[in-house]
């Protein structure tokens, strides 16, 4: 879907669960970075009061951004399901930005908490800054989009 103007989920297939979009596989290091960051916090602190998750990315990364947002939504729903009396009432938005601009992800809460993640794919660095549970946190991690052959291997072996 990185080349086409439609999403893979609109295809009618006899076994749609066997379709793996390589645009999703390409985001492996970004997903690992986000997961590693959030793994340091109790699930309650991650989902309570989360109002909006927004990914901004240039058009050439639209497929990756859209599928990354789907992955984030799924992970947050899993967290919410494990937290007592917590129903996730979060809006998820994917917005296009100027070509050449660095993608970013924002987690906006209805309290003082926030998470901002800048994805410098040219420089290979993700920078996360956050306030969760009243404390300030930051993390820097190496990121990159997988090459086509790596994305194919990721999709085939780990789907």
Language-model segments: residues:
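Extended, well-ordered protein cores
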Residues: 1-42, 120-126, 131-159
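ATP/pyrophosphate-binding catalytic subdomain of soluble kinases
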Residues: 23-85
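C-terminal, charge/polar-rich interaction regions
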Residues: 59-159
């Amino acid at each position: 879907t990185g080349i086409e103007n439609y999403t893979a989920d609109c295809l009618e297939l006899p076994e749609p669960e066997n379709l793996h979009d390589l645009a999703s596989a390409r985001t492996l290091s970004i997903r690992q970075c986000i997961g590693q960051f959030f793994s340091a916090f109790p699930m309650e602190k991650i989902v309570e009061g989360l109002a909006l998750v927004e990914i901004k990315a240039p058009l050439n990364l639209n497929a990756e951004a859209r599928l990354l947002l789907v992955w984030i939504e799924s992970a947050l729903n899993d967290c919410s399901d494990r937290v007592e009396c917590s129903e996730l009432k979060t809006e998820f938005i994917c917005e296009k930005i100027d070509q050449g601009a660095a993608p970013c992800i924002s987690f906006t809460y209805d309290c003082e908490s926030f998470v901002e993640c800048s994805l410098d794919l040219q420089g290979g660095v993700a920078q996360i800054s956050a306030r969760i549970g009243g404390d300030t946190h930051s993390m820097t991690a190496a990121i990159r989009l997988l090459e086509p052959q790596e994305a194919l291997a990721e999709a085939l072996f780990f789907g």
